[in-house]
């Protein structure tokens, strides 16, 4: 059941899209720096860039964790990329370190609802991270806020299964507190 819609001022959240953080992708005990700048995702080891997203992608958000429950840290990227006809589609991609290099290890098909914001959290306290997605119509169509939904997904071996989706217009922001607690802001 969804909570009643209400305007909530939540200044303690950081609901802006991902910009920078660090996580140990390579498993060597030294975290790599992950940057999102101008819709481009970059991975740095020290000052050396070891991976950059495809120039055709528009990376709108990212989350760091273990989205596919394989015991290794990865980057979950929310991105728009052109299909063969040039139309942009919204996709979730997992980027990880495999075989000595950082690369896309899973690329999801275009989704029906455009991905606006993402987070990884263990919402059901089973020691496995779920994917939280604030979805919307493509921002350029002007209907974004009224169509936002919050959905929860879990990994099933080679993709995500939808576990729950709110009614449209109930949620407006995903963020986190300074302690890393995920907060979904209610309201239009």
Identify the residue ranges that each predicted region occupies.
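Beta-propeller-forming repeat regions
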Residues: 1-188
């Amino acid at each position: 059941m969804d909570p009643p819609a209400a305007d909530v001022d939540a200044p303690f959240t950081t609901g802006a899209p991902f910009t920078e953080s660090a996580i140990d992708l390579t498993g060597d005990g030294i975290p790599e720096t992950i940057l999102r700048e101008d819709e481009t995702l970059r991975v740095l080891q020290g000052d050396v860039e070891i991976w950059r997203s495809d120039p055709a992608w528009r990376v709108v958000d990212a989350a760091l964790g273990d989205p596919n429950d394989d015991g290794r840290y990865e980057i979950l990227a929310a991105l728009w990329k052109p299909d063969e006809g040039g139309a942009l589609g919204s996709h979730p991609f997992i980027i990880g370190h495999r075989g000595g290099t950082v690369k896309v290890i899973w690329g999801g098909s275009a989704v029906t609802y455009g991905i606006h914001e993402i987070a990884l959290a263990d919402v059901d306290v089973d020691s496995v991270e779920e994917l939280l997605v604030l979805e919307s119509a493509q921002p350029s169509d002007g209907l974004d806020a009224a169509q936002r939904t919050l959905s929860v997904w879990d990994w099933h071996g080679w993709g995500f299964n939808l576990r729950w989706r709110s009614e449209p217009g109930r949620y407006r922001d995903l963020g986190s507190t300074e302690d890393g607690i995920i907060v979904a802001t209610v309201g239009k």
